[in-house]
């Protein structure tokens, strides 16, 4: 086959793949987000879709939702409520039900992966506990979660639900500001943390590169770039371009107060060894071999 013909064939194949084997995207139901909730012992699933028939300018959405005994059944029924063929290739957000545990995350993550693999841009949150109306709230929930990602330099990909066998860690949406963080252990209780502790957990999990949070009892806000390195069980927290913004007529040593709170948050996060959320056991075993005693994790804070 000549080179021009080969290029033409590849172009045709790519076009068919992108448009769904001959069906244009404009004729398909484009899924942007999937939300799950549990209500009265049953699952509820909501598909947020691009409304391609909307007459107004800008991005418009529509929803399809259903209830089922399982998450898979609820999602299948929501899909069946739509007249067109679904396209998951642009799916970039999924919300797990509030209060979910590790088993829920694995089940729902597998279901989503089957729909949208490999889904490199798909972000995962845990939904808040508010009683949402899918038709009224789904679009604003989607926009809010994407805004949180941008503002806080936050990203938890679908693949991060499966990187460890003993647990996973997922940001949790909150309607006011910032985000909470869910630590879901396979063989232990799920732990939800908030504020500075949540953002430290996200940094330790490699899901954020920024702290932007109140501290010192709400007296000030810290905005800083953050990077994490480790030597055995000693974690180095590198803070760059740090800015402290007092929220009143206070004159404090903000750096010292932040360091104190970070140390307290780190101690609390590493006290429970139900799962190796921050890979400290993993790196220690790689250095010293299986069976070696794990030293108490230590945090070094470096302002740069």
Predicted feature residues:
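Residue-level signal for mature regions of secreted extracellular proteins and peptides
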Residues: 14-15
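Membrane-proximal alpha-helical signals and transmembrane carboxylates
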Residues: 2, 8-9, 18-304
């Amino acid at each position: 086959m000549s080179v021009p013909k080969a290029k033409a064939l590849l172009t045709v194949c790519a076009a068919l793949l992108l448009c769904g084997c001959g069906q244009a995207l404009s004729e398909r139901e484009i899924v942007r987000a999937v939300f799950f909730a549990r209500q009265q012992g049953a699952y509820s699933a909501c598909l947020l879709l691009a409304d391609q028939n909307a007459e107004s300018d800008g991005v418009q959405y529509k929803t399809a939702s259903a209830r089922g005994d399982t998450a898979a059944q609820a999602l299948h029924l929501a899909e069946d409520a739509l007249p067109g063929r679904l396209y998951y290739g642009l799916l970039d957000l999924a919300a797990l039900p509030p209060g979910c545990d590790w088993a829920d995350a694995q089940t729902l993550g597998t279901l989503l992966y089957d729909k949208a693999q490999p889904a490199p841009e798909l972000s995962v949150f845990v939904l808040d506990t508010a009683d949402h109306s899918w038709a009224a709230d789904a679009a604003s929930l989607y926009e809010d979660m994407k805004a949180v990602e941008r503002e806080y330099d936050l990203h938890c990909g679908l693949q991060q639900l499966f990187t460890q066998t003993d647990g996973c860690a997922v940001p949790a949406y909150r309607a006011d500001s910032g985000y909470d963080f869910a630590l879901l252990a396979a063989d232990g209780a799920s732990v939800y943390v908030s504020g500075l502790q949540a953002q430290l957990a996200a940094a330790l999990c490699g899901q954020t590169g920024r702290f932007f949070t109140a501290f010192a009892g709400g007296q000030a806000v810290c905005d800083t770039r953050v990077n994490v390195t480790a030597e055995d069980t000693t974690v180095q927290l590198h803070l760059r371009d740090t800015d402290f913004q007092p929220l009143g007529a206070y004159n404090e040593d903000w750096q010292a107060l932040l360091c104190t709170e970070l140390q307290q948050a780190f101690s609390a996060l590493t006290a429970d060894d139900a799962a190796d959320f921050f890979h400290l056991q993993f790196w220690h075993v790689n250095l010293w071999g299986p069976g070696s005693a794990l030293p108490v994790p230590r945090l070094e804070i470096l302002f740069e």
